[in-house]
Design a protein with these regions (language model features):
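A short beta-sheet element
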Residues: 30-31, 50-115, 228-312
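Well-ordered mid-protein domain cores that form the structural environment of catalytic cofactors
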Residues: 115-116, 123, 144
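Alpha-helix initiation and N-capping motif
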Residues: 107, 118, 179-180, 198, ...
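A short glycine-rich beta-alpha junction/loop motif
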Residues: 1, 87-94, 127-155, 265-271, ...
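Non-catalytic DNA-recognition/assembly elements of restriction-modification systems
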Residues: 1-13, 140-228, 317, 321-353
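Low-complexity, Lys/Gly-biased intrinsically disordered segments
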Residues: 1-40, 49-56, 189, 194-239, ...
Length: 353
């Protein structure tokens, strides 16, 4: 059956803008707020009640509705949960709403089916400079429709995998916050820090560009984790490093963001990678000491970047009494657990999709 035949409505969001009103409790999502299969309210705009009500007449977001990004980055999806914010949320035209007819189709079954066909949905999009998915093409997308009891059974299994993935994500956030708290206690709030010296990063670490000849075009479906200037976002059939290191986004909007890399990994064009070569500090200490793009010397305005020379010359506090090494010993199990959770999520996502 066509998607339009099993849905009450398939449309997009507001064609135009809304007036901001901080604290109103009425939300205006854009495509950037649809990711990791959730509606992300962390940086969402709040708008006036009047603008919300006007747009809500068109979108009428309810629990069980599916949101799909249809412009720019095509195909990111989320299912609206039974949350008090859901009924106070509308969205821009870069987001489409798929409102299932629950007499015919289970919302979660439809969501997971569309998720499994993500590459086909993306291929429907046209445009050269800015990809756009036409609502007409989306409405004609073919959906197999087993009996409702079978739909519910499939959705229940897949939903349990998603729940485990989300649990691992929350655990990783908690572990990261714990590592940051330990770092703050040992190095930021330490009254002895005034007597510590500094060294250039290049004096205590191996600092070099990532593979400038490799881009995302080389990514494969499965393999060894690869870091771009946006973070760990793909796989390569080989690995360049088998060491704990730090990957720095060196060119573009994310310049100054860092990620800890463990196990076997690579980093591609527009990145700088480094790891400790000193007995005084651990790589885990370096990732925390360099965390935050405000700490890095950014050049350029339209296109921010960090030069390799500037990265090597960046000054790093070097604590006394081997504290930076002790910190590595303390937090290494936390980072290892985070890496394990991430790998487990990869396997769970493959089972689900």
């Amino acid at each position: 059956m066509k998607l339009s035949e099993i849905c009450i409505n398939i449309t997009d969001g507001k064609h135009g803008d809304c007036s901001n009103q901080f604290g109103s409790g009425y939300y205006f999502l854009s495509a950037k707020d649809i990711h990791d299969r959730i509606l992300d309210y962390s940086t969402v705009r709040e708008i006036t009640k009047g603008d919300f009500l006007e747009t809500h007449r068109r979108t009428n977001l309810e629990p069980g509705d599916i949101l799909l990004t249809n412009s720019g980055t095509i195909g990111r999806m989320a299912i609206a949960r039974d949350d008090e914010r859901t009924r106070r949320t509308t969205f821009q035209k870069s987001v489409a709403i798929i409102k299932p007819n629950k007499v015919l189709v289970n919302s979660e079954f439809l969501y997971y089916y569309l998720l499994s066909k993500n590459s086909e949905i993306v291929e429907l999009a046209g445009g050269t400079t800015q990809k756009n998915l036409l609502l007409g093409d989306l409405r004609c997308f073919e959906i197999p429709l087993p009996p409702l009891p079978e739909q519910r059974a499939v959705a229940e299994v897949l939903s349990s995998l998603d729940d485990k993935i989300e649990l691992n994500r929350r655990m990783n956030r908690t572990l990261e916050q714990l590592a940051q708290a330990i770092y703050k206690h040992m190095f930021v709030d330490n009254p002895e820090r005034e007597g510590w010296g500094t060294k250039r990063l290049g004096e205590i670490a191996d600092v070099n560009w990532g593979d400038t000849n490799t881009t995302k075009a080389s990514y494969v479906t499965d393999g060894f984790i690869a870091f771009s200037a946006k973070g760990p976002d793909g796989y390569l059939p080989y690995y360049d490093f088998n060491v704990t290191g730090v990957v720095l986004s060196a060119i573009g909007a994310n310049s100054g963001m860092t990620w800890l890399a463990q196990g076997k990994w690579s980093c591609i064009k527009n990145t700088i990678r480094f790891w400790s070569t000193s007995e005084e500090v651990s790589t885990e200490y370096l990732v925390m000491a360099t965390f935050g793009n405000e700490k890095w010397p950014l050049r350029g305005s339209a296109q921010p970047f960090i030069s390799q020379t500037d990265a090597r010359n960046m000054l790093i506090n070097v604590p006394e009494k081997g504290l930076a090494k002790k910190f590595g010993d303390l937090v290494n199990p936390l980072f290892s657990q985070m890496d394990h959770n991430t790998e487990q999520n990869k396997v769970l996502a493959e089972l689900r999709d």
